[in-house]
Amino acid sequence: MKAFRVHTGIVAPLVRPNVDTDQIIPKQFLKRIERTGFGPFLFFDWRFDEAGNPKSDFVLNQSGYKGASILVGGKNFGCGSSREHAPWAIEDFGFRVVIAPTFADIFHNNCRNSGVLAIVTSQENVDAIAARAEKNPGYQLTVDLEKGTISGADGLSIDFEVDGFTRRCFLEGLDDIGLTLRHADAIADYEKAHA
């Protein structure tokens, strides 16, 4: 997993409540066994019409949000089935951060394991960020994990917290496999002793 300390990026506002994993990555795209290649299918049914043409009214199809790497969502973001493919698609599309008032628990954990920083903040803060991004497409924020701040050049400043374990994993670039590999010598010693 790529380490995360400070990230500056364009904000894409998608403040809809109860965005579920079926909307994030529809089931017909779940046949891959790799973690990559899901980005083109992110929000597929919202991004494209039945003929496969981009819907111009969907935020990620609008020019001001091209290259966005910070997604702002509504409450209960990532609800539904527990598929890991949803944060894989978000990460593969280019998002490093998702900000919402609440997340489904399993989705939140899957984000950590996928290298997507899921930040919980108040609805008021989400609305303030979304309003700025909607008014000024291309609006950028800086997320500083070490300081626990979200800031904009316009003076917006929001403090946030993530649990210590998640913070450590992101700062050090450790997913579950990376954490396990830190104990490779102890594991090898145990296996030798119990062979």
Curated annotation (Swiss-Prot):
A Pfam family hit: Aconitase_C
Gene Ontology biological process terms, A to Z: L-leucine biosynthetic process
Superkingdom field: Bacteria
Coiled coil: none
GO terms under cellular component: 3-isopropylmalate dehydratase complex
Gene Ontology MF terms: 3-isopropylmalate dehydratase activity
Complex and partners: Heterodimer of LeuC and LeuD.
Protein's name in the database: 3-isopropylmalate dehydratase small subunit
Designated gene of the protein: leuD
